[in-house]
Amino acid sequence: KTNTGATAYMGFLNAIAGNPEVLTEKHLENTNLIKDLTDLFKGVERVSGDETFLKEMFLNNDEYEAVIADEASLININTMLKNKKKEELYLIYPIDGVAINDSAFGFIDNKSNKKETFLKLQNYLLSDKFQGTLKEKGRRTWYGGTNDKVNEKVFNPDWGIDTKKYLNVTKFPSKKVMTEAINLYIESLRKPTHTVFCLDYSGSMNGTGIKELTSAMKYILDYNEASIDKLQFSKNDKITIILFSSKINGIY
């Protein structure tokens, strides 16, 4: 549901497939791979489409024992746990590879005389002051390699963070294979969901309102349309639709 979740999933795929040079469609058809991934995802209790919501969900529920997130988010979570005098997390890095977001920042010449502004912003982002701020927030300002000059109160070794150790980088397949892999997760690997739609059919929805509602539901429930944005349901999901106005008009 997030960049971190998707990249973690690709890492799981590569590892369970035996770390092939390139992940292919044939790997995704392997029944043993699908079984192993299904068993892995049985341990997932919740997912989130937003890193901030994921953090809040984890911090506000003591039942969760682990969370998959980016390093900076986990550092932030641990800082908050420490302040609350709660047990802190220990970070685990898959030896098969992690994804590194290099936060590319580029300029597209649109002939609007904005290059000077772009360069000012770029210089500020690369300044020692701002780079220092990023590091204090748990962001690695060096790409990949090692760094032995960090604030260990932030990159805390007691939390399993070792900036002196080189991180292996996840190998990503082609866009087509990634799309099929995500569809495989949505339609076969994740736990099934029960989604309830409560649709307002009252008089206030007459005209444009009901047309937009109907159009939205057609989009969501049409597999081909919904799959464009990875919103499709799987055959194991349960869908309930409740129509209401001043009373419940029907349940389907």
Give residue ranges: language-model regions.
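Acidic, polar low-complexity linker/tail segments
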Residues: 141-196, 203-211
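Von Willebrand factor
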Residues: 189-252
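Active-site-proximal beta-strand/loop segments in catalytic clefts of secreted hydrolases
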Residues: 1, 69-72, 94-96, 108, ...
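Periplasmic-binding protein-like
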Residues: 124-146
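Short amphipathic alpha-helical coupling segments at ligand-binding clamshell hinges
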Residues: 113-125
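Ligand-binding pocket segment of bilobal, Venus flytrap-like solute-binding proteins
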Residues: 20-91
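A conserved helix-loop-strand patch within extracytoplasmic ligand-binding domains
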Residues: 1-15
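A bilobed periplasmic-binding-protein/Venus flytrap-type ligand-binding module shared by bacterial periplasmic
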Residues: 101-116, 133-137
